[in-house]
Regions:
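Conserved S-adenosyl-L-methionine
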Residues: 72-83
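Short, glycine-/aromatic-enriched active-site segment of Class I SAM-dependent methyltransferases
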Residues: 33-56, 60-62
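Short secondary-structure boundary/capping segments
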Residues: 16, 46-50, 159-162
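Hydrophobic adenine-recognition pocket in adenosine-nucleotide-binding enzymes
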Residues: 7
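Hydrophobic, well-ordered beta-alpha structural blocks that scaffold small-molecule cofactor pockets
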Residues: 95-176
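Short hydrophobic/aromatic beta-strand or adjacent loop that forms the aromatic wall/cage
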Residues: 84-89
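A conserved beta-strand element that flanks and buttresses the S-adenosyl-L-methionine
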Residues: 3
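A short glycine-rich, Lys/Arg-flanked "PGG" loop and its adjoining helix->strand segment in the class I
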Residues: 15-32
Length: 176
């Protein structure tokens, strides 16, 4: 059993990883991959998911192509609610092929929805800037809590600087 839990989005050279997996895979190998789901990212407007540490996002269609490259089949697929919406696929050589669910037909709309996302981002940006500027006017630069990689996207997108944020703090022993 080979598992990838929330790491597939971090892979820069997917073809190299797939080539290495081909070497490791035997007739009895099972590969379990879980990652954030492109459909959830789009439907929940999670545009901060797209940043330098996540060069890719995945759909069920993506995993059918990955399974094909590995000469494997998707045995099972589920959509855990973790992290705002994940996809988990189980690849194997020893099972009947997974029947493509109707959910995959929704993925045909992803491209159009991605194009519409820019309007949503522009509106979010305008509203968030207005909200923060109002707070800045009342309190001055604001302290912030935590700075995960995806926060860098938001700060850059909003073009914030020390006039908006005084400092960023992390709680001791904090996991978030």
């Amino acid at each position: 059993i080979i598992t990838f839990t929330n790491v597939f989005a971090h892979i820069n050279n997917l073809n190299e990883v797939l080539d290495c997996l081909k070497i490791l895979v035997s007739r009895n190998t099972i590969i379990v991959i879980e990652n954030h789901y492109l459909g959830s990212v789009i439907n929940k407007n999670q545009f901060d998911t797209f940043y330098h540490e996540h060069p890719r996002s995945y759909s069920l269609t993506s995993f059918f192509k990955i399974a094909e490259k590995l000469n494997m089949s998707i045995k099972e697929c589920s959509f855990p609610k973790r992290y705002g919406g994940n996809i988990r696929v189980i690849l194997s050589n020893n099972f009947n092929k997974y029947k493509k669910p109707t959910k995959i037909s929704d993925e045909n709309k992803f491209y159009k929805k991605m194009l519409q996302m820019q309007k949503l981002i522009t509106n979010w940006k305008m509203n968030k800037k207005r909200e923060i500027f109002k707070l800045n006017k009342k309190y001055g630069p604001l302290p912030a809590k935590a700075f995960p990689g995806r926060a860098a996207i938001l700060i850059k997108l909003l073009n914030f600087n020390n006039k908006n944020i005084s400092a960023i703090y992390e709680k001791n022993n904090s996991k978030k």
